[in-house]
From Swiss-Prot:
Cofactor(s) required for function per UniProt: Mg(2+)
Name by which UniProt lists this protein: Putative hydrolase ML2424
Entry-linked Pfam families: HAD (PF12710)
Organism of this sequence: Mycobacterium leprae (strain TN)
Enzyme class: hydrolase
EC assignment: 3.1.-.-
SUPFAM superfamilies listed in its UniProt record: HAD-like
Gene3D superfamilies registered for this protein in UniProt: HAD superfamily/HAD-like (3.40.50.1000), SG protein - dephosphorylation function (1.20.1440.100)
Species lineage: Bacteria, Bacillati, Actinomycetota, Actinomycetes, Mycobacteriales
Alphabetized UniProt keyword annotations: Hydrolase, Magnesium, Metal-binding
Residues annotated as binding Mg(2+): 56, 58, 231
Keyword Metal-binding: yes
Keyword Hydrolase in annotation: yes
Family under the similarity heading: Belongs to the HAD-like hydrolase superfamily. SerB family.
Gene Ontology MF: a single term: metal ion binding
């Protein structure tokens, strides 16, 4: 089995002027002083200054795709056409049935998302993210993964979400869970309005490793003392960058590699349960979104 190319992630030469995903890191660090969790508590400064934990979001912390859950909330508010809804149904069904993400699917979804937010205000999208977190995403948090984040927090370590999910949504999830922050894909905005373009590359695959490495430099972290968690083989570059890698709800390729490398595996699903709920839950999503579109058509 061939592993993803890690050469870029391990380049020992550091150019502080060209660190990857600066936009995501800058946004996250700028937002940290104002972040408070659901209890209104601001995360405490870390006691252990050189160790941190990095968590992927989709299927690692959140059951399924956080962007699709966000899409469900938007569909319920009549933001989508029938064609858009079919795309969400397909993405969710494929994600649940195959148990892994596809780079092309992620990129295609990102393009659609950028087209959707173009011309909309950042404030509006953040507010929608808050509402949809309460309505849908909060109930999709894997309890086991949530406990792992708390273990690191209790140890006085920074805990970061590292995800291709749009920064605004990722930051909302991190803040509501009392985590240190989130690195996500950053969409460009001018005067508070999204332009429909990205500031940096999609935060996915090797890009996550670049971002973690850059964050470690900024925060003075020792990557050998850090831990990373993911469900996806696409995140092997990030998992390989730290001292401790943990496969959470892993896809088949990651499970095989984790066994080969002696990485810990934690599966908060069961094979029987995953097989049983995969298709029905995808169909339920399709029914819910189709109903939303039908209501919209009736009104039109």
């Amino acid at each position: 089995m061939a592993s993803p190319d890690l050469s870029n992630a391990y380049n020992g030469r550091i150019d502080l002027g060209s660190l990857a995903n600066n936009a995501s890191i800058n946004r996250a660090l700028n937002d940290m002083p104002t972040a408070v969790d659901d209890a209104g508590v601001r995360p405490q400064p870390p006691i252990d200054l050189t160790a941190a934990a990095f968590f992927d979001v989709d299927n690692t912390l959140v059951q399924g795709s956080s962007a699709v859950h966000f899409g469900r909330g938007l569909a319920a508010r009549d933001y989508f056409t029938y064609r858009d809804v079919l795309g969400f149904i397909y993405a969710q069904a494929k994600f649940q049935l195959l148990g892994k993400e596809n780079s092309q699917d992620v990129a295609a979804g990102q393009r659609k998302a950028l087209a959707f937010i173009e011309g909309r205000s950042v404030e509006q999208l953040v507010a929608l993210g808050e509402e949809i977190y309460d309505e849908i995403i909060a109930d999709k948090i894997w309890a086991g993964t949530r406990q792992l984040t708390q273990i690191h927090l209790d140890a006085g370590q920074q805990v970061w979400l590292i995800t291709a999910t749009p920064y605004e949504l990722a930051a909302t999830i991190a803040r509501r869970l009392g985590l240190t922050g989130a690195l996500g894909t950053v969409a460009e905005s001018v005067d508070g309005i999204f332009t429909g373009r990205l500031v940096d590359e999609l935060l996915h695959g090797v890009g996550k490793a670049h971002a973690v490495r850059s964050l470690a430099i900024r925060e003075g972290l020792n990557l050998k003392r850090c831990t990373a968690y993911s469900d996806s083989y696409n995140d092997v570059p990030m998992l390989s960058l730290v001292g401790t890698a943990v496969a959470i709800n892993p896809d088949a390729q990651l499970r095989s590699l984790a066994r080969e490398r002696g990485w810990e595996i934690r599966d908060f699903r069961t094979a029987r349960k995953a097989a049983r709920i995969g298709v029905p839950s995808a169909l339920a999503l399709g029914g819910a979104l189709a109903a939303a579109v039908s209501r919209r058509r009736d009104r039109e």
